[in-house]
Regions:
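Basic, amphipathic alpha-helical recognition segments used for DNA target recognition
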Residues: 14-77, 86-97
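A glycine-rich phosphate-binding loop feature that marks nucleotide/adenosyl-phosphate handling sites
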Residues: 69-74, 107-118, 172-176, 210-214
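Terminal accessory regions of large proteins
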Residues: 124, 143, 152-153, 160, ...
């Protein structure tokens, strides 16, 4: 316990790859899965970090830990010699580069803003910003290669192992995040949704709102925390495969792009986003407008990416009517309160039922006056809408039941516990909680 919250080095004890030590600043604790070591002489920490990430360390560990169980015993028995070269600044630079790289991810505690959004002041075309980011990323990767090879050579020379070891580092072994057009756009979209929810803001860097029950959110709005790009009023964002609501996610993504990159290149930027998403996330459709492609990604793939990013502990929860996707929406768990479901019902589900019914009635009239292929097409459209209507009506019955219960959540219980409180209103309940949802 006397070492808790002290500066040290940590590593993953069970791994199929080589040992990789990481620097831990003051303020953190550790456990058996992520053990830590502490230098007797604090000034040696950078030399030890360089040594335990060099090629030399693996020679010793092949004999001390042949099963690749890097527990404290084998690691503690590795002999250490301080290098004759001064590598302190080299190792500090490597730590800074890797930390800055990690902090570009939303899941980092020190995440500030999205890379492409940050570049928007200088590049009004997202494609130009991405090209700059890609070139800078390559420079950093080659800088890391240079630094790691210097570190390797320092210890190879020290142990006189030049005949059996090369200091060369393969680019594939450098663990920095690579610039990738599709991934960078996916991250930008995720950040934009964070801004819609109020988790992030274009006016403030870092995490802006992550309290409980929407408490204090109105005060943030009053302070002007979301002045440039207003956050959603209730933290409920419709995620629809068609445009049924003015404030659905797709419409707000377009608004976000306009706000950040401006009006002049809006269409070109939307097309770049759509093109990027079609590189891997979704298949391209010939002649499909850019905004429709973005909508298709959001309605079919965003949730999967979000689940992957947050390792099945999502912060935006997907409420779904079911298989036909008659209604789906995202709710930010930190803004959820016991009135959220009632609002979801009155503001979205009930009005959508009325719209579905009106469209079914309209299609019935058109079917009566049509013939041949046109009649067949209209009937197919009507039948599809009828299925959605029936699914949504069933969802509304269940939603009303849970809304009347005025369910509260406690963030201290974690996502796994809280996500299971809403029966089958939510998507992928079993994947998140481990149990099948309660069906009423």
């Amino acid at each position: 316990i006397q070492f808790y919250c002290k500066e040290g080095l940590t590593w993953t004890s069970l791994t199929i790859s080589s040992l990789s030590m990481r620097y831990v600043p003051n303020g953190y604790i550790f456990d058996a899965k992520g053990p830590m070591c502490f230098p007797i002489n604090a000034a040696d920490i950078w030399d030890i970090l360089g040594y335990t990430n060099s090629k030399i360390i693996n020679i010793f560990l092949k004999h001390l830990a042949p099963t690749m169980d890097y527990s404290q015993g084998p690691v503690g028995n590795v002999p250490f010699k301080s290098p004759t070269r001064n590598i302190t600044n080299i190792i500090k630079e490597l730590v800074t580069i890797h930390k800055n790289d990690w902090d570009t991810n939303e899941i980092s505690f020190e995440f500030q803003t999205n890379i492409l959004v940050k570049l928007a002041n200088d590049y009004k075309k997202i494609s130009d910003g991405y090209t700059f980011r890609e070139n800078e990323n390559k420079k950093i990767i080659y800088r890391v290669k240079e630094l790691e090879e210097y570190n390797n050579s320092s210890f190879i020379d020290l142990f006189e192992l030049n005949d059996i070891l090369s200091p060369e580092v393969n680019l594939s072994d450098i663990t920095l995040d690579r610039a990738a057009q599709e991934n960078d756009i996916i991250k930008m979209i995720s950040y934009s949704i964070g801004c819609m929810m109020g988790r992030y803001s274009l006016d403030r860097e870092g995490l802006v709102y992550a309290h409980e029950g929407n408490k204090g959110f109105a005060e943030l709005v009053a302070e002007g925390a979301y002045k440039t790009f207003p956050a959603d009023n209730d933290g409920i964002l419709p995620l629809m495969d068609e445009e049924w609501f003015d404030d659905d996610v797709t419409s707000r993504v377009k608004e976000f792009v306009r706000t950040v990159w401006g009006e002049e290149h809006l269409q070109e930027n939307l097309e770049f986003i759509a093109e990027s998403l079609c590189l891997y996330a979704i298949s391209p459709k010939k002649g499909e407008p850019a905004l429709d492609t973005i909508r298709r990604y959001l309605s079919t793939q965003f949730w999967k990416e979000h689940m992957k990013m947050y390792k099945k502990r999502p912060i935006y929860w997907l409420f779904s009517s079911g298989k036909t996707k008659a209604f789906e929406c995202l709710v930010y768990l930190h803004r959820y309160n016991d009135a959220t479901l009632a609002r979801m019902r009155t503001e979205y589900v009930v009005p959508l039922l009325a719209r579905y019914q009106a469209n079914i009635d309209r299609l019935n009239e058109l079917v009566d006056g049509a013939s041949g292929g046109e009649a067949t097409r209209l009937k197919r459209e009507r039948d599809s809408l009828s299925k959605k209507f029936n699914e949504l009506r069933s969802f509304d019955d269940r939603l009303r039941h849970y809304a009347d219960m005025r369910i509260s959540i406690d963030l201290d219980d974690g996502v796994k516990v809280n996500y299971g409180k809403f029966g089958d209103l939510l998507a992928d309940v079993k994947a998140i909680t481990g149990n099948a949802p309660e069906v009423i």
